[in-house]
Regions:
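Serine-hydrolase catalytic core
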Residues: 195-301
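Catalytic nucleophile-loop/oxyanion-hole region of alpha/beta-hydrolase
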Residues: 64-65, 93-132, 316-318
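Conserved alpha/beta-hydrolase
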Residues: 66-74, 78-100
């Protein structure tokens, strides 16, 4: 009873029961967060149902304009002997509530409340002693900062970064002049939209969706094919987080940095090579800043990989992403002391 009374004070109250998820073989539960500047917020913890007792677990954290739908990823991790959880952050996917502005954020540290609640639940309630974080794109920025700011108080054993969002994919002139100007303007007009939805499905979405040139189906209300209005407040929040990370974080845990082997700036006309590169971010930025995360960073570029490497169209790139992931997990696990 005392624990139940303390949970709301600690933040991240978790609903009492698992509920059936839309993905077959998965379940979900709600994490109640403290209200923010726009009102009530929640996060959602998703779990792959599995038999037997497991002490190792992976927590997946998605990127921007995204949510967890990669069923094959969770299934494979469970088949490899790990428990699998995914976190839909506040105002994303399963956690988006009526009236909320999707993906709204004013500081990357806002998400630390649900990360802390999820990790605490996986360890203390579910009984996992060995936890790894697998994070994609903006999730890679968020989780890297979280591990630094909390000094990894949760005892995470390893961090896997899948095409992390460590810098904006702008031209040098935009980086030097436009981005600081926009970031500074956020204090005066934070709700100003600086990038609106596109008239045509964006090229990255076309590389993913079966309806276009990809291999996957997902909820396009949660992962928007035409994008979503980007406000100055969100841009400044991301930029402030990136500037902190780019100074170095001194993380003291094994880190795997995974990227495609090249980036392409897509044009308006479809080209087959778009299915064989990162269309969203510049992979050179990931490497430039990834090595500054800590002293134990290993990396792998994947030939013909896409921005989300675990959604790659090229079969060899897709298979290699899994092979690299499991090699890293098993190496980390083998070096973990047993109690």
């Amino acid at each position: 009873m005392l624990i139940l009374l303390l949970i709301p004070l600690l933040g991240g109250e978790i609903s009492a029961q698992w509920r059936t998820d839309s993905l077959k073989g998965y379940e979900q539960r709600t994490l109640e967060m403290k209200p923010d500047y726009s009102g009530p917020v929640v996060a959602t913890l998703v779990h792959r149902i599995a038999s037997g007792t497991r002490h190792r677990a992976v927590l997946y954290v998605h990127g921007y304009n995204d949510y967890f739908f990669q069923k094959a990823l969770g299934d494979s991790i469970v088949s490899h002997g790990y428990s699998f959880y995914a976190l839909d952050l506040r105002k994303y996917g399963r956690s988006l509530r009526e009236g909320q502005d999707a993906f709204e954020a004013k500081d990357m540290t806002e998400y630390q409340e649900e990360l802390s609640a999820a990790l605490r639940f996986i360890r203390s309630t579910e009984g996992h002693s060995e936890i790894y974080i697998l994070a994609h794109s903006t999730g890679g920025l968020i989780t890297s900062l979280y591990l630094h700011d909390t000094d990894n108080r949760d005892g995470v054993r390893g961090l896997i970064l899948n095409s992390p969002f460590f810098d904006f994919n702008f031209t040098p002139a935009q980086e030097r002049f436009v981005l600081p100007l926009l970031s500074g303007a956020a204090s005066l007009m934070s709700n100003k939209v600086v990038s609106d939805v596109s008239k045509e499905p964006n090229m990255y979405a076309q590389t993913l969706l079966k309806a276009h040139h990809g291999r996957w189906d997902y909820n396009t209300n949660w992962k928007k094919t035409y994008g979503h209005p980007i406000r100055l407040s969100w841009l400044r929040a991301v930029r402030d987080g990136q500037k902190r990370l780019q100074k170095g974080l001194n993380l003291r845990l094994p880190i795997l940095l995974m990227t495609s082997d090249r980036s392409i700036r897509p044009e308006k006309t479809w080209r087959p090579e778009y299915n064989e590169a990162d269309l969203v971010l510049d992979v050179s930025d990931m490497w430039r800043y990834g090595v500054l995360l800590g002293s134990n960073v290993r990396g792998q570029s994947i030939h013909k990989g896409q921005h989300d490497l675990f959604l790659s169209s090229d079969s060899k790139a897709y298979d290699m992403a899994y092979r690299v992931l499991f090699e890293f997990l098993d190496q980390c696990s083998a070096s973990t002391p047993t109690h």
